[in-house]
Amino acid sequence: RLDFINGAYLVVLENNLPEESIRWLCDNGKAPILADPVSTIKAEKLRPVLGKLAALKPNRLEAELLSDMSICTREDAAQAARKLLDTGLGTVYISLGAEGIYAADRSGETAWVPCARCTVANATGGGDAVAAALAARMVRGDSLAETARWAVGAGALACEAETTINPAMSWDNIETILNRR
């Protein structure tokens, strides 16, 4: 199984795994890992391995927990991102709900992508759509800003559906949402 994992372009780690499994994957896996903390309760399991992750997608509360600071402003988001990157983490995409995404990487590149205009029918599934778009765009080799932009669009499109998974999810429909601005 490790050969299969190591052959991946990217491993998406959903934080419902036991802590020992997360540590094993981070210690033994060679493929880059994008982790989604899932919740503040489960986010703590990622603290010991932050420096081994290629990317992290916390929401505001998860980023506050992992950076040990409150995020009330854009400057706070930037400072929290720096604290997380100081652990050795490669890239962080802090999802700030209606305020969009603040992204930063170890090279010093940053991006603030405002939320795409949408009519929210159901926010459940929005974060998962953001994580999926981040993974897909990272694998494509998009820039930090473009990756965050597509993720914002995917989250907005997901939230427009009354169901958890929007059956209209596609790159074309995400682009339509992004062009509404």
Model-predicted regions and their roles:
Residues R1-D3, P18, K45, N122:
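Poly-acidic low-complexity segments
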Residues R1-L10, D27, D172-R181:
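Conserved N-terminal subdomain of the carbohydrate kinase-like
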Residues L2-I5, P58-L61, A133-L134, D142:
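A short alpha-helix capping/helix-coil boundary motif
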Residues I5-Y9, I33, S67, R117, ...:
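A near-ubiquitous, low-amplitude feature marking generic local secondary-structure context
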Residues A8-Q79, E99-I101:
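Conserved beta-alpha-beta core of the PfkB/ribokinase-like small-molecule kinase fold
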Residues K42-A43, R47-P48, R74-R181:
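Conserved phosphate-binding/catalytic region of the ribokinase-like
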